[in-house]
Amino acid sequence: MLLSKINSLAHLRAAPCNDLHATKLAPGKEKEPLESQYQVGPLLGSGGFGSVYSGIRVSDNLPVAIKHVEKDRISDWGELPNGTRVPMEVVLLKKVSSGFSGVIRLLDWFERPDSFVLILERPEPVQDLFDFITERGALQEELARSFFWQVLEAVRHCHNCGVLHRDIKDENILIDLNRGELKLIDFGSGALLKDTVYTDFDGTRVYSPPEWIRYHRYHGRSAAVWSLGILLYDMVCGDIPFEHDEEIIRGQVFFRQRVSSECQHLIRWCLALRPSDRPTFEEIQNHPWMQDVLLPQETAEIHLHSLSPGPSK
């Protein structure tokens, strides 16, 4: 699950990808070639998203993920400030990657004649939140509060940078098991944040808001709050609240686990059917349930250090 998320760095149609080791950098690049900066390791995964290799940055032995995508498989393009045309996810990652540790960082990228190569940080040891919940069940509220606060901060950071993630879910959140820090990953469904309505969506349907299911229209901020409500329910109950479109449209929340009344109130507020009735990020952070949040290192010491991480996938 973890690698499948790190791998999803562009919208691609399924097709075989060229061998990263066999291709050469496009001529005219001023920076040192990829091959001299990074030691390319084994193939981690491949598919419609491209191919991803493990790697090491030669200068400091930093673990990295090396992503190779073919240009003719990229469906969503953007433009850097200097006018360079790149996959939209490069644009989004460059906007959010500096000065904040709660999102996965794009360390570098290279353009080849027929493809792009993206260099991403590869934290160790980590586990994505989906696998964490699958293995351990519903989270204690103290742990869920710490995790949810960090995700909220990451989403706020993205919005402050003008980026809408559009696929907030447990599979797209990495947990650093040593430090208790979370990272938001996979901006492949993302877009530039705007105040006007969106009429396209390529995220995960069971995390999408009822206004998208019914009308194929939504506003970015209120849709993000809905997804956060689904995520919080998933944390404290061990699974998502809705599986089918009709359940999303009804919006009736039933709690399968014993959950405090304050936590239930926050979840139901985030999952208000009318977008205008949902809380703002500030209102979420000021909610009574969100007080006395553990620091990441406290979270690691209390809840994580006794755990043995499974192998990365």
From Swiss-Prot:
From which source organism is this entry? Answer: Homo sapiens
> What are the Protein kinase domain coordinates in residue numbering?
38-290
Tell me what happens on changing P81S: Abolished kinase activity
PROSITE patterns per the record? Answer: PROTEIN_KINASE_ATP (PS00107), PROTEIN_KINASE_DOM (PS50011), PROTEIN_KINASE_ST (PS00108)
| GO cellular component annotations of the record | cytoplasm; cytosol; nucleolus; nucleoplasm; nucleus; plasma membrane
User: What does the UniProt record tell us about how this protein is modified after translation?
Assistant: Autophosphorylated on both serine/threonine and tyrosine residues. Phosphorylated. Interaction with PPP2CA promotes dephosphorylation.
Reaction(s) catalysed (UniProt annotation): L-seryl-[protein] + ATP = O-phospho-L-seryl-[protein] + ADP + H(+); L-threonyl-[protein] + ATP = O-phospho-L-threonyl-[protein] + ADP + H(+)
Functional summary from the UniProt entry: Proto-oncogene with serine/threonine kinase activity involved in cell survival and cell proliferation and thus providing a selective advantage in tumorigenesis. Exerts its oncogenic activity through: the regulation of MYC transcriptional activity, the regulation of cell cycle progression and by phosphorylation and inhibition of proapoptotic proteins (BAD, MAP3K5, FOXO3). Phosphorylation of MYC leads to an increase of MYC protein stability and thereby an increase of transcriptional activity.
User: What quaternary arrangement does the UniProt entry report?
Assistant: Interacts with RP9. Interacts with HSP90AA1, this interaction stabilizes PIM1 protein levels. Interacts (ubiquitinated form) with HSP70 and promotes its proteasomal degradation.
Query: What's the reported outcome of changing L193F?
Result: Decreased kinase activity
Tissue expression profile of the protein: Expressed primarily in cells of the hematopoietic and germline lineages. Isoform 1 and isoform 2 are both expressed in prostate cancer cell lines.
**What does the entry give for GO biological process?**
apoptotic process; cellular detoxification; cellular response to type II interferon; negative regulation of apoptotic process; negative regulation of DNA-binding transcription factor activity; negative regulation of innate immune response; positive regulation of brown fat cell differentiation; positive regulation of cardiac muscle cell proliferation
Task: Give the positions the UniProt entry annotates as the active site.
Answer: D167
Q: Which CDD domains match?
A: STKc_PIM1
In this chain, where does the modification Phosphothreonine occur? T23
Gene this chain is encoded by? PIM1
| Protein name (record) | Serine/threonine-protein kinase pim-1
| MF annotations from Gene Ontology | ATP binding; manganese ion binding; protein serine kinase activity; protein serine/threonine kinase activator activity; protein serine/threonine kinase activity; ribosomal small subunit binding; transcription factor binding
Factors inducing expression: By interferon-gamma (IFNG). Strongly induced in leukocytes by the JAK/STAT pathway in response to cytokines. Induced by different cellular stresses, heat shock and cytotoxic agents.
> Which PANTHER family did the record assign?
SERINE/THREONINE-PROTEIN KINASE PIM (PTHR22984), SERINE_THREONINE-PROTEIN KINASE PIM-1 (PTHR22984:SF29)
Residues that bind ATP: L44, G45, S46, G47, G48, F49, G50, S51, V52, K67, E121, D128
What InterPro entries would the database entry show?
Kinase-like_dom_sf, PIM1/2/3, PIM_Ser/Thr_kinase, Prot_kinase_dom, Protein_kinase_ATP_BS, Ser/Thr_kinase_AS
Q: Which domain of life is it from?
A: Eukaryota
One matching Pfam family is: Pkinase
Family per UniProt? Belongs to the protein kinase superfamily. CAMK Ser/Thr protein kinase family. PIM subfamily.
Classification via Gene3D superfamilies: Phosphorylase Kinase, domain 1, Transferase(Phosphotransferase) domain 1
Phosphoserine modification, residue list? S8, S98, S261
